[in-house]
Amino acid sequence: MFMSALQLVIVTGMSGAGKTVAVQSFEDLGYFCVDNMPPKLLPKFYELVKESGKITKIALVVDLRSRAFYDEIVEMVRELDENEFNSSRILFLDASDEELVARYKETRRSHPLAMEGRILDGIHLERELLAPIKSNAQIIIDTSKLSPRQLREEIFKNFEARDTKTFHIEVMSFGFKYGLPIDADIVMDVRFLPNPYYVSELRNKTGKDDAVYEYVMKSEKTEEFYQKFVSLLKYVIPGYIAEGKSNVTIAIGCTGGQHRSVALAERIGNELSKEYPVHMSHRDMNKRKETVNRS
């Protein structure tokens, strides 16, 4: 039935135990997430994924919102356990009866299996029905005393929490005269560094040109700043990863975004790319040239 080494996580467990938070966490880890797919559709879905060749990690949420799917879920878990899909894992989210009742009362929602609106009866029935699936789970997380943030941390810890390939860095340059980038996490002002704009032969070049780059970098002030700032970034980035961030945008700004910020962004991006996936962009590098051309 399953014939590939795609990474598949079956996310299941008690209703109200945190599957919504789990799905959001898997999305941040780079998983393609599908919520409540009827198990009979999984083989066809799997074939489509395999043909596309673009999806390598899948998180599939299955639960008992419809009791009609129960036998199919158990059979699917049995097949995953017995044969070809060797890279599959089952994550079972659990919580105490008392905590689940409290959560349902807080949200004023009814349990999907509750008869005549009695929440505890629905919980007991669901726990009984899910027992065979829970016994097959490789990872069980009790969310009774976990906040959404703590549950997210547990999922990251168990599923590639320290895989820096899922963490991306955007290093961008910009000009303060055109406004701050609204999506930046870290903004650094480098207008205190020597400005190539005042060197006539460099004015119309950019920080990507060797002459401008060398002019900016030869300053002792630039070198001291660079070493200290990169040291700071290398200190805080592992903390961002541990916190569960999937990306961070570092914005380097000078007056017009043409010289100093471009040169520094290039050097910083190249250094960080030795350890992390990095994308570099220069928001305002060509704006002065475009303005001149329009005039």
UniProtKB/Swiss-Prot annotation:
SUPFAM superfamilies: P-loop containing nucleoside triphosphate hydrolases (SSF52540). ATP binds at G13, M14, S15, G16, A17, G18, K19, T20. Belongs to the RapZ-like family. HAMAP family: RapZ_like. Keywords: ATP-binding, GTP-binding, Nucleotide-binding. GTP binds at D63, L64, R65, S66. It comes from Ligilactobacillus salivarius (strain UCC118) (Lactobacillus salivarius). It holds the Pfam family PapZ_C. Displays ATPase and GTPase activities. This is Nucleotide-binding protein LSL_1171. Transmembrane segments: none annotated. One of its GO terms (molecular function) is GTP binding. InterPro entries: P-loop_NTPase, RapZ-like, RapZ-like_N, RapZ_C.
